[in-house]
């Protein structure tokens, strides 16, 4: 079995690819099936969040596997009003919802209760099968050199 042990800072030309949903891209130890049918084991540093486009390598540096973010069932909110998007982010964040934030658009794993809440604010929510790349804070450390302060204690009431 091929063991992928590192994410390359400077990606090399891929020799293979693997399509993974976010719930697998947050795991440091997991067995996966490459798009060519071969099995591989991810043996990566804990806390690493894989993003679409990342390239993984085996220890020998002879295999280079590009990560592809799988299409997933997501709710999509599109809005030109930054205030309304900020309001949506506030309410979703208050519920600790993993959230992908882009200019004029939000994505989260499809949830009809959350969809209904945002519709009550007057936002349009649609369903899509799209790649999901949530903010790293929802899962793990960012994979591209972004560093965020972490506090030993985090508590608040709801």
From Swiss-Prot:
GO MF annotation list: nickel cation binding; unfolded protein binding
This protein's encoding gene: ureE
Source organism of the structure: Klebsiella pneumoniae (strain 342)
Function: Involved in urease metallocenter assembly. Binds nickel. Probably functions as a nickel donor during metallocenter assembly.
Pfam families hit by this protein: UreE_C, UreE_N
SUPFAM superfamilies per record: Urease metallochaperone UreE, C-terminal domain, Urease metallochaperone UreE, N-terminal domain
Cellular component per GO, a single term: cytoplasm
Name of the protein in question: Urease accessory protein UreE
Any single GO BP term: urea metabolic process
The UniProt record lists the keyword Nuclease: no
Keywords: Chaperone, Cytoplasm, Nickel
Similarity remark: Belongs to the UreE family.
Primary location recorded for the protein, binned into one broad class: cytoplasm
Domain of life, source organism: Bacteria
Subcellular localization: Cytoplasm
């Amino acid at each position: 079995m091929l063991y992928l042990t590192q994410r390359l800072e400077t990606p090399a030309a891929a020799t293979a690819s693997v399509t993974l949903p976010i719930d697998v891209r947050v795991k440091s130890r997991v067995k996966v099936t490459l798009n060519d049918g071969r099995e591989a084991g991810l043996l990566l540093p804990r806390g690493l969040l894989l993003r679409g486009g990342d390239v993984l390598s085996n220890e020998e540096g002879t295999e280079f596997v590009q990560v592809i973010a799988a299409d997933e069932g997501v709710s999509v909110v599109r809005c030109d009003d930054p205030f309304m998007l900020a309001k949506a982010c506030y309410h979703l964040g208050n519920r600790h919802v993993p959230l992908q934030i882009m200019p004029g658009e939000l994505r989260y794993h499809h949830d009809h209760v959350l969809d209904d809440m945002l519709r009550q604010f007057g936002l349009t929510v649609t369903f899509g099968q799209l790649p999901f790349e949530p903010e790293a804070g929802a899962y793990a450390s960012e994979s591209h050199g972004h560093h965020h302060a972490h506090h030993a204690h985090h508590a608040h009431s709801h």
